[in-house]
Amino acid sequence: DAGRSILYQTARYVDIYKALEDISRERKLTAEERQELKKYSRLADAFTPLAKGMNSEYANQNTYDAIQVHGGSGFIMEYKCQRLYRDARIFSIYEGTTQLQVVAAIRYISNGTYLGIIKEMLEKEVAEELKPLKTRVEEMVKLYEQALEYVKEGQDQEMHDFLARRLYNMTCEII
């Protein structure tokens, strides 16, 4: 469900961006519309690598687990999970390896774009039964901020490159 949620959110950003782009071909955009176009273009660019990478990794993990549940026999031709497993492996390559998605997302991680979006989401009211989950996310965000600060303070490009995948995974887990 998390993968589907981020996919829908990304699609929403892309749809709004594309709609405004289409309108701009018909007429001149107002100043407010130009701001919206810029905002949603940035959000679409930021969320696309998260949606692709996260869903590719989830698909790989889920199909791997399906093979394990079948005791390995799910890998032979009679089972659908064999095809799904193969497709999931190819999907992550076709959509760009997860490492390419990390490279595409790291600037939005480093410049605080995702952190700002996460904080905006946390400002919203939630139903009473969801408050413990919100508290848990707030705790995760504190750790995320500490990790970001640690990497920024280090000012070591090798360390930054080494930790990029971990920061990407943290971002995906929180968003």
Describe the role of every protein-language-model region.
Residues 1-175:
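Flavin-dependent oxidoreductase catalytic core characteristic
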